[in-house]
């Protein structure tokens, strides 16, 4: 919000495909980009009180949320807890310092480090369930007072934080998260564990008001089959993490290979990830226009 140009945050990860590629970029190199997508955003307008939890490079979308809320909502407050190994590994350190100076009464930031000692013992170590519970007990955070809590980082940190917040009484719908480095998928409904249909399937897709169909072979992922048939469906990570390819199964049956982003209630209502979906009936209808 309010920035004159597109910017991205990249943190080098050993063996990381994109970070390794990005290190080789030179001035004047041209990249193709897509418009911002995904659901990990905060609505701008009104008055809100947000808690943001981030670890490592997971702070990238968190920074955008904090900046957009502070700039776009004059009466809103943002509390950020940011976990890193040490001071040198902090991303956007100067940008966060500038936000603190600009919004003295509305932006509170706490650093948590596991390889560098700080004056307050509580802020040493990892951001785990025990630490968040202790911070709540001491009044450093007030989980029940936040309109929403946004979490981004490695899956163990997200799982621990979500569980701690749930124990503290935060309703699940107020806890929003985005995975950067998954280690194991979220649970998938047991009905989705049946084998995929032995023969091929007919797939019909509703996208932008139009209905199109194609045939796919048994064992193929829907997103791959659609691409092979010349149909472009919305997607980004293709790993089940971002939910850009989220759609609703309105007819037929199918299974997801893995799920890192859909909540249990979404699965119960029939939502699936196209990049992880395989039919297990001879006809399936998927609606990408379903909200």
Q: Which residue stretches match the model-derived regions?
A:
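Structural motif
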Residues: 49-51, 79, 148
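Histidine-anchored nucleotide/phosphate-binding helix
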Residues: 59-71
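A short, charged/proline- and glycine-enriched loop
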Residues: 45-50, 199
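Ferredoxin-reductase
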Residues: 1-30, 34, 48, 84-87, ...
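Short internal beta-strands
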Residues: 6-9, 76-85, 110-113, 176-178
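Reductase modules of NAD(P)H-dependent flavoproteins
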Residues: 88-291
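Short, glycine-rich nucleotide/cofactor-binding loops
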Residues: 50-60
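Short, Lys/Arg- and Gly-enriched loop/turn segments at beta-strand edges
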Residues: 38-45
């Amino acid at each position: 919000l309010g920035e004159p140009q597109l910017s991205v945050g990249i943190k080098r990860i050993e063996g990381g495909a994109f970070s390794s590629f990005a290190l080789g970029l030179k001035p004047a190199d041209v990249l193709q980009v897509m418009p911002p997508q995904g659901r990990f955003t905060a609505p701008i307008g009104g008055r809100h009180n947000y808690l943001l939890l981030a670890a490592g490079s997971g702070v990238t979308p968190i920074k955008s949320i904090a900046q957009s809320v502070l700039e776009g909502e004059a009466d809103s407050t943002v509390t950020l807890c940011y976990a890193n190994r040490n001071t040198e590994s902090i991303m956007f350190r100067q940008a966060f310092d500038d936000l603190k100076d600009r919004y003295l009464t509305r932006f509170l930031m706490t650093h948590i480090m596991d390889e560098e000692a700080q004056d307050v013992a509580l802020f040493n170590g990892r951001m785990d369930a025990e630490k968040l519970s202790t911070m709540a007990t001491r009044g450093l955070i007030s989980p029940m007072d936040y309109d929403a809590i946004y979490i981004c980082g490695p899956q163990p940190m997200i799982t621990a934080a979500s569980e701690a917040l749930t124990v503290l009484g935060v309703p699940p719908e107020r806890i929003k998260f985005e995975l950067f480095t998954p280690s194991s998928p979220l649970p998938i409904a047991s009905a989705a564990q049946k084998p995929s249909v032995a023969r091929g399937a007919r797939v019909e897709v509703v996208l932008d008001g139009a209905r199109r169909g194609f045939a796919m072979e048994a064992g193929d992922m829907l997103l791959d089959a659609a691409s092979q048939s010349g149909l472009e469906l919305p997607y980004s990570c293709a790993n089940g993490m971002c939910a850009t390819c989220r759609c609703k199964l309105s007819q037929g049956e199918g299974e997801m290979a893995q799920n890192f982003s859909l909540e249990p209630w979404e699965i119960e209502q029939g939502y699936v990830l196209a990049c992880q979906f395989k039919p297990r009936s001879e006809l399936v209808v998927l609606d990408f226009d379903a909200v």
